[in-house]
Amino acid sequence: RINTTNNMKIFLDTADTQLIRKYYGTGLIDGVTTNPTLIMRSGRDPEEVYQEIEDIGLRDISMEVMGDSNEMIEEGIRLATKFPNSATIKVPCTPDGLLACAELSMKNLIRVNVTLIFDVAQAILSAKAGAAYVSPFVGRLDDNSIAGLQLIKDIDEVYRVQAIHRTRILSASIRYVNSVSQSFANGADIVTMPPAVFDKMYNHVLTDRGLEIFDEDWKKTQEIISKSA
């Protein structure tokens, strides 16, 4: 399977706009995923959160809709109309969710993220329904003694064999830095993660020790220079 964008993408999984603003400033964040739980924790109106994220500069914000297929379609169209530059409508991988996905993506040309993917079969149905993204829940599978990263690999293999290029794999429910690198290694196009995990991607004990050594040696060099002056 060919990654047509020739690059990996990193999304933040949060509705905390202060953290989004902070990490967007790194130039390394490509999008944001939200869900009802994250919105509830923010204590804010969902659309206020979406608007602020868009104002920060993000152009790919997963906005989850709930209800039956008609309700999800109606709400998805409304959100995509209100946020035409950033909305990705997020639906669950259920019969109603996939009906909504097909209507939104194929008839209304709206970007859809099908979430709560726990099996390759669900990823196949989502691709058939025109999903822009499928979101396998790596961490939640691992919690239940099922190899979440293997699911990423299996979905990628099916998509590659069937030449499915439109639907991209968005690895979700990430708990550890290693899951980020392994998601990409196993075929994910995008990984969404909590800000705390993104922050830890910078850190390694050997990097920290190397910086300490460089700092110590730099100070010694400065002392030598000052003595010889």
Please give the residue ranges for each predicted region.
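Active-site beta->alpha loop and helix N-cap motifs at the rims of alpha/beta catalytic domains
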Residues: 9-21, 26-28, 33-103, 138
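Catalytic cores of alpha/beta
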Residues: 18-25, 74-79, 100, 119-129, ...
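Glycine-rich phosphate-binding active-site loops on the catalytic face of alpha/beta enzymes
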Residues: 36-39, 116, 132-144, 188-207
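Glycine-enriched alpha-helix->loop->beta-strand junction motifs that scaffold or abut catalytic
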Residues: 27-31, 58, 83-85, 103-112, ...
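C-terminal alpha-helical cap/extension of soluble enzyme domains
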Residues: 159-229
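Active-site-adjacent beta->alpha loops and helix N-cap segments on the catalytic face
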Residues: 41-52, 69-74, 91-106, 119-127, ...
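Conserved, mostly hydrophobic/aromatic
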Residues: 35, 89, 126, 183, ...
